[in-house]
Regions:
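Short, well-structured N-terminal submotif of metal-dependent ribonuclease cores
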Residues: 1-50, 60-74
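Short acidic-hydrophobic, aromatic-tinged amphipathic segments that line or gate anion-handling sites
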Residues: 81-86, 149-153
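Short beta->alpha linker loops
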Residues: 53, 85-88, 138
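A generic structural signal for short hydrophobic patches within well-formed alpha-helices
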Residues: 14, 55-58, 140-141
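Conserved glycosyltransferase catalytic-site signature
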Residues: 11, 52, 56, 116-120
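Active-site neighborhoods of divalent-metal-dependent phosphate/nucleic-acid chemistry enzymes
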Residues: 82-132
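Acidic, PIN/NYN-like endoribonuclease modules and their adjacent C-terminal/linker elements
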Residues: 1-6, 26, 40, 123-153
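Short, hinge-like loop/turn segments at secondary-structure boundaries
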Residues: 65-68, 100-101, 150-153
Length: 153
């Protein structure tokens, strides 16, 4: 494959792509992005990638008694190209988490940072590798703003 562009799929996009579930048909922006994703799948210059953490996040939802689905989707995710989570990624994710926590604490804003602990890794992976993160998580834009504040430090 002659890849020119890579795109990192978040677990929600893996779910949309592989299972066709959780698609809000009233969300015009999501439908447009999924239509674009289908175009990307057929584009030989684009490679869709995941990380071991995304694999874990996607596959952990299949219960012990769902072996057939688990095995089917485990085989499907094995077909993606993998990006390792490097030290640079963990450093960036750690620093973004620390800054986010500091800002929330200093403003007295309660924030569920634990809910975002995987997403900050996905975001950092995309940033370190210079690729786009395809996600439907609403707080990714907030992470982009946080990243810009971190860069300005």
């Amino acid at each position: 494959m002659n890849t020119e562009i890579a795109k990192l799929l978040d677990s929600n996009f893996l779910t949309y792509l592989l299972e066709g579930k959780n698609i809000d048909e009233n969300d015009g922006n999501l439908i447009e992005r999924l239509t674009d994703l289908l175009t990307l799948i057929n584009d030989d210059s684009v490679e869709l990638v995941i990380t071991p953490l995304l694999r874990y996040e996607f596959l952990r939802k299949f219960g012990q008694n769902e072996s057939e689905d688990f095995n089917k989707f485990r085989a499907a995710v094995e077909e993606f190209t993998w990006l390792d989570i490097s030290k640079d990624v963990t450093d960036l994710a750690t620093n973004l988490y620390r800054l986010d926590k500091h800002e929330a604490d200093s403003k007295g804003i309660p924030k569920n940072l634990e809910k975002r602990k995987f997403d900050v890794f996905h975001f950092a992976t995309a940033k370190i590798n210079g690729i786009e993160l395809l996600s439907n998580d609403k707080h990714i834009d907030q992470m982009e703003d946080l990243y810009e504040r971190y860069q300005a430090l």
